[in-house]
């Protein structure tokens, strides 16, 4: 099953073209990655798929449903597409306890057994339940990113968008988070779309990848090509 299909995607900011004629598909259960230097357009594509960037041209479908420019994600679509951002501290409200941050999306959807769901999500990312009583500044960078991943898991998404999920973390923590993501993907049968400029991260996580430069996809790589290092930009 094709989870994401993009054809001729174009995104322009003022007079600058951020994404030009991009096209690719992502199959259920795989990790597909976009690799490229900062500013090449890969995160913009992620924001289109997440419904955060609503001004674009082209064809985009998610789970077989056509997505239109300006469309607001609601219902199952909003639940099934979740995003983990680059900086975990910036994506957590500094004045809210982690309990409020984690419980709020469940309350909005009228979910039941909220405390149990939050506890399970924290345990799945290796954090004790009493972490929920704390504030973001009381956690390490790696712990904050685990909380962000837990928040994404709470709604049980089918597609997880990962925007440089380890680039703001110390090297010693990066491998832990990447291994956690791989483990969770298998346990929850999710599909990942990963953005990174790090060739090692791409090789560790990906089934397939695409190299971007100046808003365009230049080349695709399968697993064999990545094992040979053909995806490296240097």
Where are these regions (language model features)?
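Conserved structural motif at the start of ABC-family nucleotide-binding domains
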Residues: 4, 19-21
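The feature captures the beta-strand-to-loop junction immediately N-terminal to the Walker
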Residues: 35-37
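Helix-to-loop junction immediately C-terminal to a conserved catalytic motif
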Residues: 50
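ABC ATPase NBD coupling module
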Residues: 66-82, 96, 100, 108, ...
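Conserved ABC ATPase "signature" region
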Residues: 115-130
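Conserved ABC ATPase signature
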Residues: 135-139, 143
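A short, proline-enriched helix->beta-strand linker immediately N-terminal to the Walker B motif
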Residues: 154-158
């Amino acid at each position: 099953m094709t989870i994401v299909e993009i054809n001729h995607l174009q995104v322009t900011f003022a007079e600058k073209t951020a994404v030009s004629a991009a096209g690719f598909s992502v199959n259920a259960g795989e990790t597909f990655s976009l690799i490229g230097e900062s500013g090449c357009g890969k995160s913009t594509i992620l924001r289109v798929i997440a419904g955060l960037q609503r001004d674009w041209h082209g064809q985009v479908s998610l789970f077989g449903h056509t997505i239109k420019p300006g469309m607001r994600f609601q219902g199952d679509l909003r639940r099934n597409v979740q995003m983990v951002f680059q900086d975990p501290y910036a994506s957590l409200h500094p004045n809210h306890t982690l309990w409020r941050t984690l419980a709020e999306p469940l309350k909005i959807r009228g979910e039941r057994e909220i405390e149990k769901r939050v506890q399970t999500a924290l345990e799945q990312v290796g954090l004790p339940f009493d972490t929920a009583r704390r504030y973001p500044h009381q956690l390490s960078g790696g712990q904050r990113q685990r909380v962000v991943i837990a928040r994404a898991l709470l709604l049980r998404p089918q597609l997880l968008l990962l925007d440089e999920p380890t680039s703001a973390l110390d090297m010693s923590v990066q491998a832990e988070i990447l291994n956690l993501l791989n483990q969770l993907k298998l346990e929850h049968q999710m599909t990942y779309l990963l953005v990174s400029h790090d060739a090692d991260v791409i090789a560790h996580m990906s089934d397939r990848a695409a190299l971007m430069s100046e808003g365009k996809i230049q080349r695709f790589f399968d697993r064999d090509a990545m094992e040979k290092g053909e995806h490296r930009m240097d």
